A protein has these predicted regions:
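Structural marker of alpha-solenoid helical repeat scaffolds
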Residues: 58, 91-92, 125, 159, ...
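Bacterial N-terminal signal peptides that target proteins for export
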Residues: 1-9
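N-terminal leader/linker segments that initiate helical-solenoid repeat arrays
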Residues: 20-68, 74-77, 84, 379
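Structural signature of tandem alpha-helical TPR/SEL1-like repeats
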Residues: 41-54, 75-88, 109-121, 143-155, ...
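Terminal, low-structured helical/coil segments at or just beyond the last alpha-helical repeat
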Residues: 29-32, 278, 342-379
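Helix-start (N-cap) detector for alpha-helical repeat units in TPR-like alpha-solenoids
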Residues: 27-31, 63-64, 96-98, 130-131, ...
């Protein structure tokens, strides 16, 4: 499973010229240079903040210095300080960009109503403001008003069809509504508009996989992996897609990469263990699944897989203990009941095996392996 989050608009630092008061011309000209240096740093560091602060001291009417300082403090995580500077900027000049920036800070502070008020004030003056519409959509989503948020973003897309962030957020919302075709279309558009946007490529791959478009999923996820070679999520997703395509060596390579990058990643360990079982590499599967079991000892799936690997190597006592642990933890795990049935069958306990196969089929009528096993022991 993955979680998707809406992205708020990125507000750029200002480098535009300023009106220089005649009585302080030299000081304000120096302030302009300080602001330019701050923009060049642009990392929210103490050094950047200090430059804007000095610029304000020299030229108190330089609105860009207040605004940029607010954004720098926002990047530092100093939201109260950021709010204060952005409000000072608005006092000097009631600008749409300043209010959008303030709304973003208020949202990060958890002041949803205050943030919404700022976006709405911008839209009253300029109904075509795409950043304000994007921000309003984020708030509507937080208020569980997803259909309204979608309509808001569709309006933004009509105003500016070149904004990749609008389409990315549309994809996230359509996905939340389980409109997977629409989500895939929105993510695809976002990628077309900005081929460097990792999240759009990654989520496009996830949607294509969910829709069964495995080759399209492969292409999108491979493109995402090229953008962020060390991102664990994309390699996990690639491993799943490769496995569905029957490309087990590539799936194994992806999972091993995740296990190497993040040894405590449970999903990678258990999926690698299952793949090793399919490849009949039972000893390594057992070692891998033991690692997974140490990470999540209450997960029935890992105990079922571990029991199956031990069963294939003839470690009957350990296999039975682990398979019974699996059904104890999750009595609805059809695979665990089937695997336990296979073990009991091999131990000559046909009646008990028959009962486990029947339970597996009752839980999952489409589990063909359990049906075939039941036919072998006799219904």
């Amino acid at each position: 499973m993955h979680k998707s989050y809406l992205k708020v608009s990125f507000i750029a630092l200002l480098t535009i010229g300023v009106v220089v008061p005649s009585h302080a011309e030299q000081a304000c000209l120096k302030s302009v240079e300080l602001v330019k240096k701050g923009v060049q740093i642009g990392d929210g560091s103490d050094a950047e903040v200090a430059l804007y602060n000095e610029a304000i001291q020299l030229c108190p009417q330089m609105v860009e210095a207040y605004f940029n300082m607010g954004l720098a403090l926002q990047r530092k995580g100093d939201f109260p300080g950021a709010e204060a500077k952005l409000r000072e900027a608005i006092k000097l000049k009631d600008d749409e960009t300043f209010r959008v920036g303030l709304a973003g800070v208020l949202l990060q502070k958890g002041e949803v109503s205050a943030s919404k008020e700022q976006y709405e004030r911008v839209l009253e003056q300029n109904p075509q403001s795409v950043p304000a519409l994007q921000g309003l959509a984020v708030i509507l989503e937080k208020q569980q008003k997803v259909p309204e948020a979608i309509v808001t973003l569709q309006k933004a897309a009509a105003i500016d069809p070149t904004n990749h962030l609008t389409f990315f957020n549309l994809g996230v919302l359509q996905e939340k509504q389980q409109h997977y075709d629409a989500a895939a279309a929105a993510y695809r558009k976002a990628v077309e508009l900005n081929s460097k946007h990792f999240e759009s490529k990654y989520l496009l791959g996830i949607m294509q996989s969910r829709l069964g478009n495995l080759e399209d999923a492969r292409r999108a996820l491979q493109a995402a992996a090229e953008s962020k070679p060390d991102d664990i999520r994309v390699h996990l997703a690639l491993g799943e897609v490769y496995e569905k395509l029957g490309e087990h060596s590539l799936a194994e390579s992806s999972l091993r990469r995740v296990a190497q990058m993040s040894p405590n990643n449970f999903v990678a360990q258990v999926n690698l263990g299952l793949l090793l079982i399919e490849n009949k590499e039972y000893s390594e599967a057992i070692a891998t699944l033991n690692k997974a079991a140490s990470l999540e000892p209450k997960n029935a799936r890992v105990w079922s897989a571990l029991g199956r690997a031990q069963l294939e190597l003839g470690h009957m006592e350990s296999a039975e203990a682990n398979l019974r642990q699996a059904v104890t933890l999750d009595g609805s795990n059809a695979f665990a009941h089937n695997n336990l049935g296979v073990l009991l069958q091999r131990l000559g306990k046909r009646e008990e095996a028959r009962s486990e196969f029947k339970t597996a089929l009752a839980l999952n009528p489409d589990l063909e392996v359990a049906r075939k096993n039941l036919e072998v022991v006799g219904e």
